[in-house]
């Protein structure tokens, strides 16, 4: 397997308890960074229905453009190569307004992100794939069960082992999301691009090479760094069988403790562990005296 990397079809789930203003800010900060070229950038936002209206309002107020069905089809046909079922390399890292123009869609020049509402995830919805540009799929879900389902569908379509994002104040749900998603890194309440590459929003190792583990046919799920490039040599010495001896249940160690030997009942045999110096100093004779 390769050390890293793999495709990142990153889902971003905004759960009903999330700080919505911050979640939207994080999403825009991440998706507009390098015009969405980072493979860890969000490829779809999955929003609980109860937040959808406020989500759309906030995004529109910040120059994000929601495509209608006709516009979605035009952008989809241009952004995703139908033969390869992969992103058109011409759009990678390009501004949203440029992409819209090439697709035949008129949007304001200051548009930051093109957002397409989709009914489901799958090959029949090309914009649910990795896009590496400021084009974002958008799904509305009833609850966290459906939110998790859509997030995993995104990963299964082409992002296994990479990254997944969740915005929530429910720590138990965040933990469950982390346990459920088949990814190497789960970004919680942070922008995915900056969060996945590490150091800025968390303690992940800073790296632009993100391992996807066995899910993505990589050898590691970590952020690849110099540590992964160091050859470690191990000398394996022969190990003998364990040596042991039995000690008594009580050990007396204070001064003059050998006097207790006189009071111990049932002693028929004694084994004295000593050395020549202790013999010369007379310490062994003291022990023998009390044993007799």
Label the predicted regions:
Residues 47, 168, 190, 273-274:
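Short beta-strand/turn micro-motifs composed of small residues
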Residues 54-59, 176-180, 283-291:
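Short, aromatic/basic amphipathic alpha-helical patches
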Residues 5-7, 37-41, 129-134, 158-161, ...:
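Short glycine-enriched loop/turn motifs at secondary-structure junctions
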Residues 242-292:
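ATP/NTP phosphate-donor binding region
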Residues 105-241:
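Conserved C-terminal structural/oligomerization subdomain of aldehyde/semialdehyde dehydrogenase
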Residues 2-122:
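ALDH superfamily catalytic-core signature
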Residues 48, 99, 134, 254, ...:
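Residue-level signal for inorganic ion chemistry
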Residues 14, 116-117, 138-142, 251-258:
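Short acidic-hydrophobic, aromatic-tinged amphipathic segments that line or gate anion-handling sites
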């Amino acid at each position: 397997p390769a050390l890293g990397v793999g495709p990142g079809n990153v889902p971003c789930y905004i759960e009903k308890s999330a700080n919505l203003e911050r979640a939207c800010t994080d999403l825009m900060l991440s998706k507009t960074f390098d015009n969405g070229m980072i493979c860890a950038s969000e490829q779809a936002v999955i929003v609980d229905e109860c937040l959808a209206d406020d989500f759309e309002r906030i995004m529109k107020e910040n120059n994000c453009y929601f495509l209608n069905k006709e516009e979605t089809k035009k952008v989809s046909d241009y952004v995703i190569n139908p033969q390869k079922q992969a992103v058109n390399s011409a759009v990678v890292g390009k501004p949203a307004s440029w992409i819209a123009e090439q697709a035949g869609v008129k949007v304001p020049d200051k548009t930051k992100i093109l957002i397409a509402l989709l009914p489901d995830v799958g090959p029949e919805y090309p914009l649910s794939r990795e896009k590496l540009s400021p084009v974002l799929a958008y799904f509305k879900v009833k609850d966290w069960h459906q939110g998790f389902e859509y997030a995993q569908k995104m990963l299964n379509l082409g992002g296994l082992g990479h990254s997944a994002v969740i915005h929530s104040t429910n720590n138990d749900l965040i933990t469950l999301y982390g346990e459920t998603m088949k990814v190497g890194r789960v970004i919680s309440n942070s922008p995915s691009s900056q969060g996945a590459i590490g150091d800025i929003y968390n303690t992940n190792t800073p790296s632009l090479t993100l391992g996807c583990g066995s899910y993505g046919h990589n050898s590691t799920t970590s952020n690849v760094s110099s540590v992964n490039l160091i050859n470690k040599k191990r000398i394996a010495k022969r190990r003998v069988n364990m040596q042991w001896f039995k000690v008594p249940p009580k050990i007396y160690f204070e001064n003059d403790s050998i006097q207790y030997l006189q009071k111990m009942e049932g002693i028929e045999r004694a084994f004295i562990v000593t050395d020549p110096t202790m013999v010369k100093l007379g310490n062994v004779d003291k022990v023998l005296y009390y044993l007799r």
